[in-house]
Regions:
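Central helical "cap/lid" subdomain
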Residues: 224-258
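Helical element adjacent to the flavin cofactor pocket in flavoenzyme catalytic cores
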Residues: 145-146, 170-232, 237
Length: 258
C-alpha cells in the first residue's frame, strides 16, 4: 500500500547529492568481479583497482540500496562476547586478539576516513550505555573497569544524578560513556566509497543480478541479468543478502541481534 506523502527510503538519503554516472555496458572480461556494492564490495574493489587489476562491481539493485546506507551509523569497539567468555572457549591469547579486532576496526575507519578525506560526518561523540536498574548500573560500572584495566578501552561512569548532561532524560539509572566511539553518516560514507572506487576506474553497475558463477580453466564465467562476464577472480560481498547463488556461503550467514 502506498500512502500519499510517505517515502519508503530513509530520510537521510535526502542529504546525498546526485548519484554519479555508473557503468551501462557490461564488459566481456575483467580481472576481478565483485558481487555486491555495499561497504565490503566497494572496499574490496578499491583495493584491487588500486593494485592495477580491472575491476567490475555488480549489484541486483541500486549500489548501496541495502544495509550499508540504512544502518544507524554507530562505530564502536564492541565485540559481543566478553574477554572471559572468549578465553574459556579459545584461550586467553586468542581471546585478546579477537577482542582487539573491535578496537582495530574503530581506529581503521577513523584513520581511513581522515587519510582519504571522506565527507561523511564522522564524529567522535562517545556512546552512552544506559542502565535499566540500579543493579544494572553497578554491573556496567564494574564491567567498564574491567575493560579499562584489561583492554585499555576508555570510559567513564555517569550516575543518575548527572545523567541529564548526557541524555536530557531521567528514564535510566545512570550509565557508562565509552568516549572513543564514533558516529558516521552511513549513506555519505557509502557514497564516498563509491567515489573512491570510480576514481580508481572501477566499473560499477546496478540492477544487474548475478545468476550463476561457474569455474573455468582461466577463472570464472559469471552469468548476469545483462549478459556474461569472464573474470579471473570473483569476490562475493553479499553478506545478509546472500542467496542460493552461493549456497556454501548462504548456509554460513546468520542473523545477529543488534
Amino acid at each position: 500500500m502506498t500512502l500519499p506523502g510517505i517515502t519508503q527510503s530513509p530520510y537521510w538519503h535526502e542529504q546525498l547529492g546526485e548519484t554519479p554516472e555508473l557503468c551501462t555496458t557490461l564488459p566481456g572480461q575483467v580481472d576481478v568481479l565483485v558481487v555486491g556494492s555495499g561497504y565490503t564490495g566497494l572496499s574490496a574493489a578499491i583495493q584491487t583497482a588500486r593494485g592495477g587489476r580491472t575491476t567490475l562491481v555488480l549489484d541486483s539493485d541500486d549500489p548501496g540500496f541495502g544495509c550499508s546506507t540504512r544502518n544507524g551509523g554507530q562505530i564502536s569497539t564492541s565485540v559481543k562476547p566478553s574477554l572471559e567468555k572468549l578465553s574459556a572457549k579459545f584461550g586467553p591469547e586468542k581471546a585478546r586478539r579477537i577482542r582487539a579486532e573491535g578496537v582495530n576496526a574503530l581506529h581503521w575507519v577513523r584513520n581511513f576516513t581522515e587519510t582519504e578525506g571522506l565527507d561523511c560526518d564522522l564524529r567522535r561523540v562517545g556512546r552512552f550505555h544506559a542502565a535499566h536498574t540500579p543493579q544494572h548500573y553497578e554491573t556496567l560500572v564494574r564491567e567498564a573497569e574491567q575493560l579499562r584495566s584489561q583492554e585499555n578501552i576508555e570510559s567513564f561512569a555517569v550516575p543518575r544524578s548527572e545523567q541529564r548532561r548526557e541524555l536530557g532524560s531521567d528514564a535510566y539509572f545512570g550509565g557508562v560513556v565509552f568516549s572513543d566511539h564514533c558516529s558516521i553518516h552511513p549513506a555519505k560514507f557509502h557514497r564516498e566509497l563509491l567515489r573512491l572506487a570510480l576514481t580508481a576506474d572501477v566499473e560499477v553497475m546496478g540492477h544487474c543480478a548475478v545468476t550463476r558463477i561457474e569455474r573455468t580453466s582461466s577463472g570464472f564465467e559469471v552469468n548476469t541479468a545483462k549478459g556474461v562476464v569472464q573474470a579471473r577472480d570473483v569476490i562475493v560481498a553479499t553478506n545478509g543478502y546472500t542467496t542460493a547463488l552461493t549456497p556454501w556461503l548462504q548456509r554460513r550467514v546468520i542473523p545477529i541481534g543488534s
